[in-house]
Curated annotation (Swiss-Prot):
Intrachain S-S bonds: none
GO molecular function: electron transfer activity; heme binding; iron ion binding
Organism this protein belongs to: Methylorubrum extorquens (strain ATCC 14718 / DSM 1338 / JCM 2805 / NCIMB 9133 / AM1) (Methylobacterium extorquens)
Protein name: Cytochrome c-L
PTM statement from Swiss-Prot or TrEMBL: Binds 1 heme c group covalently per subunit.
Gene name linked to the record: moxG
Coiled-coil region(s): none
Pfam families given in the database record: Cytochrome_CBB3
Chief location category: periplasm
Entry function: Electron acceptor for MDH. Acts in methanol oxidation.
Lineage: Bacteria, Pseudomonadati, Pseudomonadota, Alphaproteobacteria, Hyphomicrobiales
Keyword annotations: Electron transport, Heme, Iron, Metal-binding, Methanol utilization, Periplasm, Signal, Transport
BP term (GO), one: methanol metabolic process
InterPro entries on file: Cyt_c-like_dom, Cyt_c-like_dom_sf, Cyt_cL
């Protein structure tokens, strides 16, 4: 009787191992990154391989997915594009200067979601959505376009420099906030090509 129990237990263990091991050997869905992006409301991991095609292979996106650093933050060519993307995708709810309308203001140091003080958190909110009318924008903006939009939002910031955690010390010293009427030239040199017109 004891041998039958041992054999049964061993067979059960082998069966479970046979089921579990192939599942463990399967590749994970989506690209593996150094940063885990989480839904702003639920905390669930976001699959950044989903959404609008393109805009995932730029050096800036690769760096951001690995480190959470947005290389576009102070690049004039990316600010130019971010302004246009923000105007079409965000300003209807957040205001032309991110001062807030139906949605909260994004240009001061009060954040409805504290995670949005970081570029990783703001990216996750744009990508996966939040409460209320803030739906996910991963179907109408690529990750590269999201980074350009974030750069523009950060450029509109009017709060104290010390609260701008997305800027490093060198960037804080050089930071010049947006001045109404400021125009960034279409031919501004930098990492971002002009958007298709």
């Amino acid at each position: 009787m004891m041998n039958r129990v041992k054999i049964g237990t061993a067979l059960l263990g082998l069966t479970l191992a046979g089921i579990a091991l192939p599942a463990l050997a399967q590749p994970q869905s989506g690209p593996q990154t150094g940063v885990v992006f989480r839904n702003t409301v639920t905390g669930e991991a976001l699959d950044v391989s989903q959404g609008k095609e393109g805009g995932r292979d730029t050096p800036a996106v690769k760096k951001f997915l690995e480190t959470g650093e947005n290389l576009y933050i102070d690049d004039k060519s990316c600010l130019r594009n971010g302004e246009s993307l923000f105007a079409t995708s965000c300003s209807g709810c957040h205001g032309h200067l991110a001062e807030g309308k139906l949605g909260p203001g994004l240009n001061d140091n009060y954040w409805t979601y504290p995670s949005n003080t970081t570029d990783v958190g703001l990216f996750a909110t744009i990508f996966g959505g939040a409460n209320g009318m803030m739906g996910p924008h991963n179907e109408n903006l690529t990750p590269d376009e999201m980074l350009q939009t974030i750069a523009w939002i950060r450029h509109l910031y009017t709060g104290p420099k010390q609260d701008a955690v997305w800027l490093n010390d060198e960037q804080k010293k050089a930071y010049t906030p947006y001045k109404q009427g400021e125009v960034i030239p279409k031919d501004a040199k930098g990492q971002c090509k002009p958007l298709d017109e």
